């Protein structure tokens, strides 16, 4: 096992300085960025892994217990956390070593203010979810003292677990086209990360390829109320004379609000536009809504399992270079929109 003393000898710096930097205390001790980079580079080159059993955490965990922090944004995505949490717990139950999960809520664009992440004194590793553009820039510019895995984000120097966001949008557009739709509207919130933009871009590209006219998009709040109010407003204005054949929703929550608004206005059964959502909410809510909601399913539980595997792999020294994993997605047809043609005969 590579020691702090060996790293100090490699770079010609005192062991105490190396210990301060690897312990996340460099800023408060005013150690230069150049020195920090030299130490981190040597640690990576030599394959240094922190001695987790010896590290003393303020939380008072046992010598063999690993503390993994889950950073989750304090916004509309808070309601989506349970599915991810369930996936983490299911995977942790398979491991022999005890792992304690700790939730750290944070405000988008302010991840850099999370001392638990930058100090390394409260946890052995972290899974960062919902990072914004500014948060990703912070991560790219920073050498963190603990292993980090990103959920559904890509950043140089970090392990990550992702899905093909372009394909998510494309599958929805193809399903609409296969159901004979000619016009489609989009209900989504303002994009807070590149994946949201990619989903809509994929939807437009695939829609245009199949002759689907995509109506001008206007953003709404990401939630049930946001979907309800967006559809109610459009029914009084631009959709008053002519409904679109289809509506693609950026989240399950937006879709449930949209369905309520259509129902109140008398658009039920065959009168209802085809509707597909990015399936990021509870699966039961989508399956048992009236009508049941067709989704391009986001496999959050599976992504969580992969995240914790990458965390443990880094802590055990099995993963020493950043690794990204891309998980498959699928379209789940229900009552709000029928199947893709290739599956229609099955």
What are these regions (language model features)?
Residues 124, 182-183, 213, 245:
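Short acidic/polar active-site loop segments enriched in Thr and Asp
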């Amino acid at each position: 096992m590579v020691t702090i003393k060996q790293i100090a000898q490699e770079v010609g710096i005192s062991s105490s300085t190396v210990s301060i930097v690897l312990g996340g205390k460099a800023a408060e001790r005013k150690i230069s960025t150049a020195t920090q980079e030299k130490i981190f580079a040597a640690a990576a080159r030599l394959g240094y892994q922190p001695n987790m059993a010896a590290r003393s955490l303020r939380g008072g965990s046992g010598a063999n217990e690993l503390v993994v922090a889950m950073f989750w944004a304090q916004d509309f995505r808070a309601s989506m956390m349970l599915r991810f949490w369930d996936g983490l717990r299911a995977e942790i139950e398979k491991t022999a070593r005890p792992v304690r999960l700790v939730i750290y809520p944070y405000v988008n664009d302010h991840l850099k203010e999370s001392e638990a992440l930058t100090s390394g004194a409260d946890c052995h590793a972290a899974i960062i979810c919902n990072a914004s553009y500014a948060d990703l820039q912070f991560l790219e510019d920073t050498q963190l003292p603990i292993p980090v895995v990103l959920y559904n984000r890509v950043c140089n120097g970090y392990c990550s677990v992702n899905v093909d966001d372009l394909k998510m949008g494309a599958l929805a557009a193809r399903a609409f086209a296969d159901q004979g739709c000619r016009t489609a509207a989009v209900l989504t919130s303002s994009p807070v990360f590149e994946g949201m933009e990619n989903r809509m871009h994929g939807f437009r590209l695939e829609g245009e390829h199949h002759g689907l006219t995509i109506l001008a998009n206007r953003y709404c709040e990401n939630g049930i109320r946001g979907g309800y109010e967006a559809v109610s407003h459009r029914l009084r204005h631009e959709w008053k004379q002519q409904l679109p054949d289809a509506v693609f929703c950026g989240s399950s929550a937006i879709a449930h609000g949209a369905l309520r608004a259509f129902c109140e206005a008398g658009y039920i059964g065959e009168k209802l536009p085809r509707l597909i959502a990015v399936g990021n909410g509870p699966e039961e809510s989508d399956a048992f809504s009236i009508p049941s909601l067709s989704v391009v399913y986001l496999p959050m539980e599976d992504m969580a399992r992969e995240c914790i595997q990458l965390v443990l792999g880094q802590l055990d020294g099995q993963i020493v270079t950043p690794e990204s994993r891309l998980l498959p997605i699928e379209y789940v047809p229900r009552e709000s929109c029928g199947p893709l043609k290739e599956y229609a005969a099955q």
